[in-house]
Amino acid sequence: SFPTRRSSDLSCKQLLMLSGIDKYYQFAKCLRDEDLRADRQPEFIQIDMEMSFVEEEDVLQVTEEMVRYAVQESLGKELGSFPRITFDEALRRYGSDKPDIRFGCELVDLTEEAEESGFNVINDADYTGAIVASEQLSRSAIDDYERVAKDVGANGLLYLQRGEDAVSGPLSKHVDTEPFIEALDLAEDETALIVAGRKRSAQEVLGHLRLKVRDDYDLTDSDNHAFVWVTDFPLFEWDEDDGWQPAHHIFTMPDEEHVDSFAESPGETLSQSYDLALNGVELGSGSIRVSDPDLQRSLLDFIGVGEEEAEEKFGFLLEAYNYGAPIHGGIALGLERICALLTGKNDIREVMAFPKNQRARNPMDGSPTEIDESVLDELGLEVRDGTS
């Protein structure tokens, strides 16, 4: 046999807190099977922190002071306190749990107007919302926005445009547009892009469209560093195949109201977790951890991890809990993401010495390379192609 990564490194940080080491801080090298986008690499560095005897407010304050100090020292900019919004508010206003708060173009909820419209495409939808572009978009531009909407899960895109004398767009042929115009506060020569569907997915589609409006019309300044805390994430998310699963990870502490009742109302249970975002990019994520063995076992059991499996995978941690665990929590921040955003770079590879390319290879030395057969023989390993 040979070792594999069975569980999160978070367990190791928790063990440090349980053993009496009340503060942990490390620039941790991470290897992860990431999809290779501009803000991701398979090898990266996290600023990793864990603290004992803390509440959520303590972690937020320590992290914020560190980031503000770093910005002051590196850029000479003095930042004020970071605003805080809840997960629900972030989706409701920005269509994202990592919102770019540098510009407006916030989502407008049109669900009530849609329900009263009599148009079955929208009046039966769980949610109908819109964003307003302060431009009279061309047909080809609207087609571009529709392609983006469909790429991220929408069935289609509706729109309304207000001209000098009339309101146009496919929706205008089926509904009384006046309630929509009033709710949108749609001015002359503006275009409203409208999405209907399941609430969260429709909000997230609008969030993507909002960022396209930002980029198309250059609504932001890269020198404006708008940090924001997002708090009160759901503890669980529903999965059609696996049922209720942790939205973050199963070691996250439920909110105080639902510590004893999360199984009865999982969809309403929030977590003591938090993310730090900058200009629409997630910089880091953290939480207050579970510190009670019975609660941890109950959470694992709720998501389908039985007692035997729990002991096999997490027995060392569950046993450590029994010796008395302090309340503890922490956060991990992506160092390269922070450096890229603070220096105005669009790709984290621009702030890395030896980044991987789009095929996850190091162009400098060609790694990773094929393993020499003699090395495999020495270790007693055999590599198969996955089809046998």
List where the protein language model places each region.
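Class II aminoacyl-tRNA synthetase catalytic cores and aaRS-like
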Residues: 1, 5-388
